[in-house]
Amino acid sequence: MSELRDKLQSLLARQGLMSGAEWRRKTEELAQRRASGEFEIDRVVSGEVVGDANAGFFLVRTEFPLDTAHGNVTLGEALLALPEHVALSANDADLRDFAPETAIFLDTETTGLAGGSGTVAFLVGAGYFDGAVFRLEQAFMRDFDDEEPMLRYLDGLFTGRDAVVTYNGKSFDIPLLRTRFIQNRMPFRLDAA
């Protein structure tokens, strides 16, 4: 019998698998670590809770001076982009009046890629020019009841924005955010941008 047990242990080790007892021990250890708060975002990332104790999202704010370089280009150089060049490169005549200083740059991380009413944007990154800096704000839902205060905050960021810049926002990010705003009975300002 011990020969069979030794073979099983060897096979488990070779495949990187755990025995039932090891699995149970690791699961209990992980549960204790979670209960201690070790994995709470505020212990890993500098930021603040916005809202109240019952429903407040986690916000990380970062400012980048306009002389911050990305490759060979500084952030400030984006403000020099000619609208007609932007429209031509995007093959979109509607961008002939594009002004980076009034745009909001968005990206979302979601609970799934299917879209629809069950998909939630648990992390929304929003960047915008503000005087001599480019501000990046990352709003993170720690739980589902954080969504409404996070959307209210984002609504304030969207106010006064003339354009939205995203990677795949027209087909994913914007429809997803629109759905979340509607489900929370809030107007979606980006439809006008």
Language-model regions, residue ranges each:
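N-terminal accessory regions of nucleic-acid-interacting proteins
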Residues: M1-A99
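Short glycine/serine/threonine-biased micro-segments
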Residues: T110, L123, V164
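RNase H-like nuclease fold core
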Residues: A114-A132, L136-R142
